Amino acid sequence: MVTLAIDMMGGDDAPGIVLEAVEKALNDFPDLHIILFGDEKQCNIKHSRLEFRHCTEEIEMTDEPVRAIKRKKDSSMVRAAQAVKDGEASGCVSAGNTGALMSAGLFIVGRIKGVARPALVVTLPTVSGKGFTFLDVGANADAKPEHLLQYAQLGNIYAEKIRGIGAPKVALLNIGTEPKKGNSLTKEAYQLMSEDTSFHFSGNVEAKTLMDDAADVVVTDGFTGNMVLKNLEGTAKSIGKMFKSTLLSSVKNKLAALILKKDLNEVMKKMDYAEYGGSVLLGLDGNVVKAHGGSNARAFYSAIRQAKMAGEEHIVEIMRETVGEHNG
């Protein structure tokens, strides 16, 4: 049985989509137990494996992260993180304030001993539909070469255990594929990664080939990663708008759209973040999953499934025994 702590109040469309996702997850996974934190007046579901805990506070998207975590002790997010810290749950899931959740992860759940800086990891789509693990996408704007090495170690474990990829190809995001390309950060990180035998380092990869299955795990600093992530999201939305505009521009195009509807939907499904769940803060002494703030019920359900799998595969324990002990 895996127990997860869920923040019912976080997200643009909470608590509605959270409750819908929780109910589906409980019905789909007989080995899942959920502790739900939020306003009891807004909870309209009951289940034998659902435990509800009323909270009197809520962290808003506009709240200053660290201040909110310290002052709103009875918020649904803080109490969900505390449940992980106390060992009541193997992980927590929230679609709330990203900065606040990262702060809760750092200050409440805590880092694995030996991990210098946790990294925010996401799974992004590729042309083949396989996807790739990308980190750091915003936990730390600045990074040192040794931090990127740890990200590679953490990302390798995540790709193996959560995504089921044997011997993942781990690459470093750079401005060229040659070993000597890049700035001092990437050059030094390249050297460290090429000397590490705990994962398969495939070298540098350029941003233009990210979606062409260039690697299973791609590592970068949080500043670069966040910009790449937002650029990919924005580009996907813009292409979708261009497709729609073109297909609705004439009767001929509308007929073509009807014929191609199934194929177009398949392409859009490959590009949909909801298929891949949320982002995970790796390197913490517990599983912390951040669902997209604009998540629908399907996306939040995917985030729950992701957190459940992390608990089942004991990735925190593995990271503690490998990355943590190696650097402790």
Swiss-Prot record:
InterPro entries: FA_synthesis, Phospholipid_synth_PlsX-like
Chief localization: cytoplasm
UniProt keyword annotation of Secreted present: no
GO terms assigned for molecular function: phosphate:acyl-[acyl carrier protein] acyltransferase activity
Keywords linked to the UniProt accession: Cytoplasm, Lipid biosynthesis, Lipid metabolism, Phospholipid biosynthesis, Phospholipid metabolism, Transferase
Biological process (GO), any one: fatty acid biosynthetic process
Pathway stated in the Swiss-Prot or TrEMBL entry: Lipid metabolism; phospholipid metabolism
Catalytic activity: a fatty acyl-[ACP] + phosphate = an acyl phosphate + holo-[ACP]
Pfam family, one: FA_synthesis
Gene3D superfamilies in UniProt: Isopropylmalate Dehydrogenase (3.40.718.10)
Top-rank EC class of the record's enzyme: transferase
Top-level taxon: Bacteria
Subcellular location: Cytoplasm
Its EC number(s): 2.3.1.274
Disulfide bonds: none
Gene Ontology CC entries for this record: cytoplasm
Complex formation: Homodimer. Probably interacts with PlsY.
Family annotation (NCBIfam families): plsX (TIGR00182)
Family: Belongs to the PlsX family.
Function: Catalyzes the reversible formation of acyl-phosphate (acyl-PO(4)) from acyl-[acyl-carrier-protein] (acyl-ACP). This enzyme utilizes acyl-ACP as fatty acyl donor, but not acyl-CoA.
Protein name in the entry: Phosphate acyltransferase
Taxonomic source organism: Staphylococcus carnosus (strain TM300)
Lineage: Bacteria, Bacillati, Bacillota, Bacilli, Bacillales
Gene expressing this chain: plsX
